[in-house]
């Protein structure tokens, strides 16, 4: 089970939002590269970056911070990034800069042809981000709910060749209410590619629950507010996941 610390970037700083609201931002660090180093030193095997300004602007807005993070840890672990990726040129720029994966969210829903082209041009490097509330997909930094069912879109995007799916339950993100295990497993069972859970991770019990469903295709979980607020000790959580995986492998 991959525990993936999130570094959300707003105006060059590392912040956390409550339910995607840019006006409810808590600044956790003015040095995102140092934050990246901290998580890697604590045992992170992948990092999840979000360009929050980019998500709302539709183009890259935190390049300096992203490049600083990649300079710091990009040679050691894979780094993935979402937010504002709307063109093949942007995908190429980010991959050339050293990102391992780019996450396409809103653009995948609004312009599936772009996602298909990206998967063809950059096979193995494209993750799709599906944000949902009550099973329906949301776009544009969560500000718009669509009529699309998550599983329908996931199956379509799997056919395009996406590497994996980051699935966020909007109702729970930044609220420390626990991961929506049921919805995440339902999605993972419907597709043949890995699903990364996101939104609501709050404690070690969530880690236990996720490890139990890893065999269904839930590959990892993005760790956000809980590891910044101190509700969840990241190193202890990764250790717990590794121990559980060992027990399950030996069972």
Curated annotation (Swiss-Prot):
Q: Where in the cell is it found?
A: Cytoplasm
Identify the metabolic or biological route this protein is part of.
Amino-acid biosynthesis; L-histidine biosynthesis; L-histidine from 5-phospho-alpha-D-ribose 1-diphosphate: step 4/9
One of the GO biological process terms: L-histidine biosynthetic process
GO MF, one term, reads: 1-(5-phosphoribosyl)-5-[(5-phosphoribosylamino)methylideneamino]imidazole-4-carboxamide isomerase activity
Question: Per the record, GO CC terms?
Answer: cytoplasm
Q: Which NCBIfam families match?
A: 1-(5-phosphoribosyl)-5-[(5-phosphoribosylamino)methylideneamino]imidazole-4-carboxamide isomerase, PRK13585.1
- Protein name as it appears in the record: 1-(5-phosphoribosyl)-5-[(5-phosphoribosylamino)methylideneamino] imidazole-4-carboxamide isomerase
> Lineage of the native species?
Bacteria, Pseudomonadati, Pseudomonadota, Betaproteobacteria, Burkholderiales
């Amino acid at each position: 089970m991959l525990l993936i610390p999130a570094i959300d970037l707003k105006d060059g700083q590392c912040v956390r939002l409550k339910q995607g609201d840019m006006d409810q931002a808590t600044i956790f660090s003015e040095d995102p590269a140092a934050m990246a180093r901290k998580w890697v030193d604590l045992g992170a095997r992948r990092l999840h970056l979000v360009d929050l300004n980019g998500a709302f602007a539709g183009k890259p807005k935190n390049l300096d911070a992203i490049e600083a993070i990649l300079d710091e840890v990009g040679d050691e672990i894979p780094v993935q990034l979402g937010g504002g990726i709307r063109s093949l040129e942007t995908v190429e720029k980010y991959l050339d800069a050293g990102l391992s994966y780019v996450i396409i969210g809103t653009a995948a829903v609004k312009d599936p042809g772009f996602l298909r082209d990206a998967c063809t041009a950059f096979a193995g490097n494209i993750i799709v981000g599906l944000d949902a509330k009550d099973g329906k997909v949301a776009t544009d930094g969560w500000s718009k709910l669509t009529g699309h069912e998550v599983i329908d879109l996931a199956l379509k995007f799997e056919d395009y060749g996406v590497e994996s799916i980051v699935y966020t339950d909007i109702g729970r993100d930044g609220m420390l209410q626990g991961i929506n295990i049921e919805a995440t497993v339902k999605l993972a069972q419907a597709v043949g590619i890995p699903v990364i859970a996101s939104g609501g991770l709050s404690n070690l019990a969530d880690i236990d629950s996720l490890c139990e469903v890893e065999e269904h295709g839930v590959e990892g979980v993005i760790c956000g507010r809980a590891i910044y607020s101190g509700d969840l000790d990241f190193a202890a959580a990764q250790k717990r996941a590794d121990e559980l995986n060992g027990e399950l492998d030996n069972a």
